[in-house]
Amino acid sequence: MTIRRLPPVLIDRIAAGEVVERPAAAVKELVENAIDAGATEIEVLVVGGGREMIRISDNGSGMSADELSLAVERHATSKLPTEDLLAISTLGFRGEALPSIGAVARLSIASRPKSAPHAFEIRVEGGVVTPPRPAALNGGTRVEVRDLFFATPARLKFLKSDRAEAAAAADVVRRLALARPDVAFTLMTDDRQPLTWVARSMDEAGRAARVADVLGAEAGRNLIPVVGERGGVRLVGLAGLPTYSKANSLSQFLFVNGRPVRDKLLMGALRAAYSDLLPSDRYPVLALFLSLDPREVDVNVHPAKTEVRFRDGGNVRALLVRTLTDALAARVPSTAGTIADRLVELARTPELEPARPAAAIPEFRPYRAEPMPAGGYDWRASPARPLNVAEPDGALEAEMESFAEAVQASFDVGMPAADARADAAVPETGDLDRPLGAARAQLHETYIVAQTREGMVLVDQHAAHERLVYEKLKAALERDGVARQGLLVPAVVDLDPAEADRLAERAGDLAALGLVIEPFGIGAVLVREVPALLAKADVTKLVRDVAEHSAEWDDALPLERRLLHVAATMACHGSVRAGRRLRVEEMNALLREMEETPNAGECNHGRPTFITLSLKDVEKLFARR
């Protein structure tokens, strides 16, 4: 078979396979052209998922008749004034989009510069160009794409449903709208309600407002500002609370010099920054903007221009990880507002239960027939009214009696305190002004109820203490290692032979965390020392859990990350368990320590440690609002 030159139309169709693989790609290229033309208002219409029609209208600089003819030729562009590809400041630069779209669709472009007496329109159908002719247009440019891929029908078989393609196109517009808050956008898809985003300023306040416009008010309430700079690279933006996360990465918006990207290096940095805060299957919501010298980043590495290559990728990664880590650690303890909203919603829309026989439903009488005793009811147990609880053992009896008396004292409103322990049950009024308030009660020996000036806080005692222990282990690692405590009698832990071998290989890593082990025959290890923070933990269960999680370690994972994985497992064993009764002083001490600890709003697995309900939320529960 001899070599031959391909005809221009076929060349354009081949190129279109890289540049325009789906309707969303065409929308991206056309909106980027509008932004590069200086438009401040852009309108996007998508019909039939983009297969039937895509129309982009803008108020940019416009093109003359001669420029229209050049615009539909391959590699003709106004965006490269020189031959330097390392100083690109525009979104587009190759001059491939319009001829590629025209090769596989019916394309029409009407444009009018501000100084021109009227507009001109050019048409391209399947690669065949019709010369420009006069047209009616007030100003700017209008690009209309109909019957996308009619010239390459095989491509249509690979498209998804109209709804899915329209959603992909909308995502493209959202990303570009976030990149340029100073541009007003209107998005229309079929019969859906148009989305309009007004122009904002390009400063941090304008970016935050545009993020709230595009992602919704709920996202705006659950994002915190981040600002950082390192080695000539500046980072600004908004990062989501760990408790406000998604099941996919579609809500992660990254921009480099105003260009939306989905770069592997940047995505890896995000995972590292949130590794202690989110489980592996959850993704933070964020919008981050990197600015650097165009010569320090190569944007010409992917046909769709969605990937970039940094000259100093390590510097960029370090900036992202450090800035996000510091911002998340420095925040006042808080949880996603959506948690309280969902709680209110669930409380006000109870699930339907299967109907029960009428005889099984006791009659509810809100008022008693007999009068209330003058001294009020005695809430304490008596032989006539025994409490339906298990008898405490001797070790806990004194503590439980003290707790019961403290609770009884809190019920005796207006009565003098019986002793000093009753006074301890009522926290200082000043605690109400603290972020997590003053402890008032414990529910099911698992949850702490605290009161604040503005409402109430519900704390998961195990999750909260797990985070506190984990942060202490991390701090000890960063200093001079975790303090150890020797066992009076070394513990022998039986394991699967493979697990025992893995732990033996990691003995050095574990020693840095205070867990000193050594091989003890086949399928067993001998534990000589444990971290001092975990002195009361079940050694056998601790070692078995560490062995189980060690199977998930990747040898390529840095030592620091492996140690933190072990620390997270240890923290779970060293924390207050659900089912343990706490005194009021212990509950308040836990709250105060949470206020001083970084990332106290979520446990090591990404679950919230507490939720806050404002008085307004509580009033909603009782339909008072």
From Swiss-Prot:
Keywords: DNA damage, DNA repair. One of its GO terms (biological process) is mismatch repair. It comes from Azorhizobium caulinodans (strain ATCC 43989 / DSM 5975 / JCM 20966 / LMG 6465 / NBRC 14845 / NCIMB 13405 / ORS 571). This is DNA mismatch repair protein MutL. Gene3D superfamilies: 3.30.230.10, Histidine kinase-like ATPase, C-terminal domain, MutL, C-terminal domain, dimerisation subdomain, MutL, C-terminal domain, regulatory subdomain. The lineage of its organism: Bacteria, Pseudomonadati, Pseudomonadota, Alphaproteobacteria, Hyphomicrobiales. NCBIfam families: mutl, PRK00095.2-4. One of its GO terms (cellular component) is mismatch repair complex. Disulfide bonds: none annotated. One of its GO terms (molecular function) is mismatched DNA binding. InterPro entries: DNA_mismatch_repair_CS, DNA_mismatch_repair_MutL, DNA_mismatch_S5_2-like, HATPase_C_sf, MutL/Mlh/PMS, MutL/Mlh/Pms-like, MutL_C, MutL_C_dimsub. PANTHER family: DNA MISMATCH REPAIR PROTEIN MLH, PMS, MUTL, DNA MISMATCH REPAIR PROTEIN MLH1.
